[in-house]
């Protein structure tokens, strides 16, 4: 047993990655699935698609790697967070589509929660906001709107899970109804201080606690797969939500260590050690990982549009054919043009949390063209990251959160974007050799539990740097550019 199978179940596709005994990738497979938009602001997945693409990519990756069933020592799972699945305990059939983390159908209910003053209690216990982003209101919606669902849940006939829980249920043939602390911490039902489901919040949302999964450490025994899936039973030994898995994959194990993942959106997590820091700047307080029953906490900032701004250049403006073109365009852009893009296509995330505002462009002249738009698009990601780091610095007083920022995700491959990021935050930006940090984090959780991979200290020592981007921008220019960004955001919020 020399390999680890990492399952990375994401928002638009399912992936399976095989890691060898030295934590090198030997094979992978990926399959996209359909997105469903039944109403304005609604986003759903067919749970059957989540399962079929996961099982299919696992088999494909194992076949590509040329492995036998006995070669797989363990499975690690990482997943899109907050997405909700409810299914029948006996048949395993979902009662409704999975409601995705992006879904905003419960916005009016969340406003009612805030108006009635429940948001402070929710934040105090869970570290989260009263926002449709999180699982609790989605689960309540299913129980309230699917015929018979609430009665069946009360009778103990239905089960709830985030995507990891649903996949483990399917992988084990219904033998395990479990989750890990990082996924539980994103539901708005879990008390991150007491380490258990909150009776008070479950009562507020009218959620029967019997439908909630058992919560385990990130590295634990989550069950074994059905023998018919991969030729033999394989233990599932590691689970973490995608951004927490990336934090682990980046070896951000010490307080003050910070990572930022640049995909469709951007998620920055700051390790705050054994202290759950309450944010005064609308960041999220969450669990970074949990070992041996002891949680390590983090401050998290979420940006809704990062890599998606480049997709907008390609699909919306149609000024590029592929993302890699933006680097040369940004280099060609007229330095005397001060175009600022606020990419609030779906609102603004942390620290603003305004779901209603929309994107805007400032500083246009007759000479502004595709190159200036490309530069403004890449710069917007750096500006938003600085917003997060400023908020983190204010929340975690006395600590330098800008010592070094570790980056990963598709957009981190852009040298221009990473150099601008370093310039605007005035701190070094480290890009690792292994950019598949999310899958690596899940693989390490399972591998070290299986005895195949090194312990935490050994894994941290194995983290390898590909390139450091150091600040080069003049301080006065940095201040002028960021001040222009802040004015642009203020105008966007007031529009």
From Swiss-Prot:
Species assigned in the record: Roseobacter denitrificans (strain ATCC 33942 / OCh 114) (Erythrobacter sp. (strain OCh 114))
EC number: 2.7.1.30
Lineage of origin: Bacteria, Pseudomonadati, Pseudomonadota, Alphaproteobacteria, Rhodobacterales
Record's protein name: Glycerol kinase
Residues holding ATP: 11-13, 264, 307, 311, 410
GO MF terms, alphabetically ordered: ATP binding; glycerol kinase activity
One GO process term, biological-process aspect: glycerol catabolic process
Record keywords: ATP-binding, Glycerol metabolism, Kinase, Nucleotide-binding, Transferase
Keyword Transferase: yes
Activity regulation behaviour: Inhibited by fructose 1,6-bisphosphate (FBP).
Listed pathway(s): Polyol metabolism; glycerol degradation via glycerol kinase pathway; sn-glycerol 3-phosphate from glycerol: step 1/1
Binding-site list for sn-glycerol 3-phosphate: 11, 81-82, 133, 242
One Gene Ontology term, aspect cellular component: cytosol
Residues the record lists as binding ADP: 11, 15, 264, 307, 410
